[in-house]
Regions:
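Conserved SAM-binding strand-loop segment of SAM-dependent methyltransferases
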Residues: 1-10
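A short acidic, Gly/Pro-enriched loop at the edge of an enzyme's catalytic core
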Residues: 10-20
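A conserved beta-strand element that flanks and buttresses the S-adenosyl-L-methionine
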Residues: 21-22, 52
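Short catalytic micro-motifs in class I SAM-dependent methyltransferases
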Residues: 24-28, 55
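Core SAM-dependent methyltransferase catalytic element
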Residues: 106-133
Length: 133
């Protein structure tokens, strides 16, 4: 059975599940709420169940973050976006989206109880993870 929810992830009453997917959602949650969500998801999964989550990620340091931002902005320009559109989007996300680093996301999963975690997708500053209970 598939259940699609449209509400705060913190308010969802997860049933026992074999698979839970989060697609670019957690990065918009307040950082102090994220561990609670990971814990809740882990506890809702059947043994051997998977949690797939995709997030925008920060680079491990400022130098690499500058490089990733530049590469991503160049990509957007090649896709036809104007400098004004790129800057407008960046400003609109300021204070609303707070991505963690790759390691920060892995650490959330580990603290929740996941021990088998791997990156399944990576493109510039976007990454997908699979965590298995």
């Amino acid at each position: 059975n598939i259940n699609i929810e449209c509400s705060s992830a913190l308010d969802v009453d997860f049933n026992k599940s074999n698979l839970i997917i989060s697609y670019y959602t957690i990065q918009f949650m307040h950082p102090s709420s994220r561990q609670y969500l990971f814990d809740k998801i882990y506890n809702s999964l059947e043994w051997g169940g998977g949690f797939i989550f995709f997030e925008k990620v920060r680079a491990p340091d400022a130098r690499f973050q500058d490089i990733m931002t530049q590469v991503y902005n160049e990509f957007k320009v090649k896709q036809g976006y104007s400098a004004e559109e790129i800057m407008g989007k960046s400003k609109s996300l300021k204070g609303v989206m707070e991505p963690f680093s790759t390691q920060g996301n892995i650490d959330l999963a580990k603290r929740a109880g996941f021990s088998d975690i791997m990156s399944i997708f990576k493109n510039i500053c976007f990454e997908g993870f699979l965590a298995i209970k």
